[in-house]
Amino acid sequence: MDKNISFTLKVWRQKGPKDKGHFDTFQMKDIPGDTSFLEMMDILNEQLINEGKEPIVFDHDCREGICGMCSMYINGHPHGPATGATTCQIYMRRFKDGDTITVEPWRSAGFPVIRDLMVDRSAYDKIMQAGGYVSIKTGGIPDANAIPIAKPIADEAMDAAACIGCGACVAACKNGSAMLFVSAKVSQLALLPQGKVEAARRAKAMLSKMDELGFGNCTNTRACEAECPKLVSISNIARLNREFIAAKLKD
């Protein structure tokens, strides 16, 4: 059975995107090791509410590592110290008694702070609206099974489609680049017959929108790949670059 731990929790507080932020420090006592990180935040918020204080605002939804909304920067890592896991999949057993845990929001010009630990990630939605879809007629439901796709290609497309759009890649990147996200969304369609028809338009449109929204460029530090909770490979960025160059040559 996991032991209870006590630790110091430093949490970033900020009223809005234009306001100056600061850290608040809390002493957490006897938190069970099998408590998830978000459950620990719930415990803290319950204490704050009981004391008549403002609870900490943070984003969450499924709490199962699927939705990507639990965007917290924990001790210098997007989603915390674990590999291949989101914040909601982190348990307090990963920390030691007496630790100091620092929690911040994603830091990026493309993700302005809404309040405290919650950021506005609607920029990703705008990038997807620019071209992250198939608009051509692809036939009825049975037709998909009639199109042969080699298993290695299907596997690559599925690996790219594992991206949950959480924004950890942007938070990890020193340039605030969204290239891993964009490349995953481009790759999952460019690899399949249904997506090839609009491949050129898609690559140009999504990269253009990424630049327009203030995200930086990729300089191959691979920090995004190291911190991605779904282990999306930067080989997708190479594919995106090939797709973009091929599209520009057709202009």
Q: Regions from the language model: what does each represent?
A:
Residues 4-27:
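Eukaryote-biased recognition of intrinsically disordered, low-complexity regulatory segments
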Residues 12, 29, 74-76:
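Short strand-turn-strand beta-turns centered on an Asx-Gly dipeptide
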Residues 24-36:
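Short, contiguous acidic and Ser/Thr-rich linear segments
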Residues 35-54, 101-251:
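Ferredoxin-type iron-sulfur electron-transfer modules in oxidoreductases and energy-metabolism complexes
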Residues 57-69:
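Short, structured protein-protein interaction patches enriched in aromatics and acidic/basic residues
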Residues 66, 72-74, 224:
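Functionalized membrane-embedded alpha-helices
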Residues 74-98, 103:
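Glycine-rich phosphate/adenylate-binding loop and adjacent beta-alpha elements
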